[in-house]
Amino acid sequence: MARIYASLFERLVANTYEPENDQACWTWKGKLHYKGYGQLNARIDGKHTTMFAHRCMAEIMLERKLEPNEEPDHLCLNRACINPDHLDPVTRKVNLDRKVARMKAMRKGAKVMPV
C-alpha cells in the first residue's frame, strides 16, 4: 500500500538519502529520469502526472510555480539533488550559459567546483 504523506515537501524529503552534513546534497533515491533528474508520480486534480523532484522542491521553497522560461539550476552540479539551497531558479538561457562556461573551464583543465 502506498504511503500517505502530509505534504509534498514531506514526500520529497522522505525520498532522499540522509545528507552527510548541513551543506550536503539531498540526493533523490526514487525513480530517475534518463538524464539523472529525480522523478515522482502524483495525482493532481484527479489526473496522473510525472514531475521532476527538483522543480517541485524549488516551487515549494519559492511558494509559487516556476515561470515557463524558468528552471532550477543545480549549483552543486548533482542532477539528483533536491536540496533547496543548491537550486537557483534562473532562465533557460542563464542555465545554458553557466553550463557552457563550466564545460569551457573543464576543457582548459580547470576543476569545476560547484558555485
Tell me what each language-model feature is.
Residues M1-P72, L77-V115:
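Conserved recognition-core residues within compact binding domains
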